[in-house]
Amino acid sequence: MAIERTLSIIKPDAVAKNVIGQIYSRFEKAGLKIISAKMCHLSKPQAEKFYAVHKDRPFYPDLVKFMTQGPVMIQVLEGENAIVKNREIMGATNPKEALPGTIRADFADSIDANAVHGSDGPETAKEEIAFFFKPDEIF
């Protein structure tokens, strides 16, 4: 099995609920190491650039607005099959469809305020990690 890295963002809704520690615990219980982390408040240009892949989608303006409404916690996770493992513990994008015990089932309010973001593949993970972290910030 391959050791991978993936980007995870705890979104403003989950940060506001004060569940960062509970989410970190789930990463660790799944065998994922947090090898870098930072809290920040995304600017509108940062959010627009990060989510540029969705620029032509109808939800894009609301996504940018949501992601800039409060602080986020951004982390790099590392472990065996980290990308798939993180997506499994996050749960379905729509929390109503997320399996019980997943982060979104337990902490998300809606498909828009869905608590967490995770990279969807190896190339995306590399790009997303590089967007937020310099190589010397990852341990």
UniProtKB/Swiss-Prot annotation:
Gene Ontology molecular functions: ATP binding; metal ion binding; nucleoside diphosphate kinase activity
SMART domains (alphabetical): NDK
Keywords, alphabetical: ATP-binding, Cytoplasm, Kinase, Magnesium, Metal-binding, Nucleotide metabolism, Nucleotide-binding, Phosphoprotein, Transferase
Binding site for ATP: K11, F59, R87, T93, R104, N114
Keyword presence, Amino-acid biosynthesis: no
Subcellular location: Cytoplasm
A GO BP annotation: GTP biosynthetic process
One GO location term (cellular component): cytoplasm
Catalysis: reaction(s): a 2'-deoxyribonucleoside 5'-diphosphate + ATP = a 2'-deoxyribonucleoside 5'-triphosphate + ADP; a ribonucleoside 5'-diphosphate + ATP = a ribonucleoside 5'-triphosphate + ADP
Xref: CDD domains: NDPk_I (cd04413)
Cofactor entry: Mg(2+)
Catalytic machinery residues: H117
Top-level class of the enzyme under EC nomenclature: transferase
EC number(s) from the headed UniProt entry: 2.7.4.6
HAMAP family: NDP_kinase
UniProt cross-references to PANTHER family, sorted A to Z: NUCLEOSIDE DIPHOSPHATE KINASE (PTHR11349)
Function: Major role in the synthesis of nucleoside triphosphates other than ATP. The ATP gamma phosphate is transferred to the NDP beta phosphate via a ping-pong mechanism, using a phosphorylated active-site intermediate.
Oligomeric and partner information: Homotetramer.
Similarity annotation: Belongs to the NDK family.
Protein name: Nucleoside diphosphate kinase
Organism (species): Coxiella burnetii (strain CbuK_Q154)
